[in-house]
């Protein structure tokens, strides 16, 4: 899903994306600001249920604008169910977004409040589609859990991920990353908001049902600095740290945000 014609600086950043990806100005773009007083409590929403098998964890990759932890997704060993979904969604990957300072690195905001970072756990609709590639552009193709991260205490549950970053310092590097259950990164409460949105970077497909956890998790300033120490360049060229990779909030354009609580 990555391509070299976009990034996060002035010349190729979010303000420019619509030139190459007109859907950037679409009606269902993400992220959004969640206005808690306008979110509608929906009693039909079921509790979120995640069942992730640590054996499906596969590898960690520097993709140039971020890093991804990828999972084996050829069967339903690791799935998301419940919430607004009637189908089960298969775990594919997780990644983080961060900013150049601790004040603002999240993508979603809540009542205008910005967070330091944001975790995205990505799933695809394996009940209806045969692969992520097929699902990624479909309206009901993807389900992403978003977890806001607040600067404060170090989060020991991030340590295994952070310890792997040294092996993927530059763009294109990959390393095995095994025996990991990403549900350990979720907050203790799985109360959530949900809305219909998009991928938050090109190709910006409007194919994501978002599950944004109400409760945040912690991350320390030092841990955030480790994210920013990753490089967007290939090995052997001038080092360019990945300082930020968060898209600003987009207009709701009449969409409803529903709350499970």
From Swiss-Prot:
Modified residues (N-acetylalanine): 2
Subcellular location per the Swiss-Prot or TrEMBL entry: Cytoplasm
InterPro entries: CA_dom (IPR001148), CA_dom_sf (IPR036398), Carbonic_anhydrase_a-class (IPR023561), Carbonic_anhydrase_a-class_CS (IPR018338)
Entry superkingdom: Eukaryota
Main location per the UniProt record: cytoplasm
Annotated positions binding Zn(2+): 95, 97, 120
Active site, UniProt feature: 65
Ranges of residues in domain Alpha-carbonic anhydrase: 4-261
Regulation: Inhibited by acetazolamide.
Reactions catalysed according to its record: hydrogencarbonate + H(+) = CO2 + H2O; urea = cyanamide + H2O
Function field: Catalyzes the reversible hydration of carbon dioxide. Can hydrate cyanamide to urea.
Name listed for the protein in its UniProt record: Carbonic anhydrase 1
Species per Swiss-Prot/TrEMBL record: Macaca mulatta
